[in-house]
Amino acid sequence: MSCNQDTEILMLALFQTIDLALNLYTWVLIASAIFSWLYAFNVINSRNQFVNAIGSFLVNVTEPALRPIRRILPNLGGIDISPIILLLIIFFIRSFMWNTLYPMTV
C-alpha cells in the first residue's frame, strides 16, 4: 500500500467515526426530547429510580450542547426549540463533512 492509500483509509475511518458519534448524539437528542415530553405530561413515574436515572443521563449528555443555544434563542413561552436547532446544526456538520471535507482528502 502506498502512503496515499494509507492516508485515505485513515481519513475514511476518522470521518466514519465522527459521523457515527454525530448520528448517535442525534438519537440521544431525540430520546431526550421524547423523555421530557413524557415527563412533562406525567406519562412516566418521576419517582421511579430507573426512570430518574435515564432522565439524569439524558440531561447530563444533552445539556452542555443545548445550554449555549438556549442562551442565544429568545424565550418562546415554554416551547424549547433548542433541540431542533442542534439537530439542524448536526445535519449541516455531517453534510459539510461528507460533501466538502471528505472529497478534499481523496
Curated annotation (Swiss-Prot):
Topology versus the membrane = Multi-pass membrane protein
- Keyword ATP-binding applies: no
The SS bond pairs are none
Going by the entry's taxonomy, the superkingdom of the source organism is recorded as Bacteria
| Keywords, ordered alphabetically | Cell membrane, Membrane, Transmembrane, Transmembrane helix
Q: Where in the cell is it found?
A: Cell membrane
Could you confirm whether the keyword Membrane appears in this record? yes
User: One GO cellular component from the entry?
Assistant: plasma membrane
Give me the segments passing through the membrane: 24-44, 73-93
Pfam family for this entry, one = YGGT
* Primary location recorded for the protein, binned into one broad class: membrane
For this chain, the family text in UniProt reads:
Belongs to the YggT family.
Q: What is this protein called?
A: Uncharacterized protein Atu2659.1
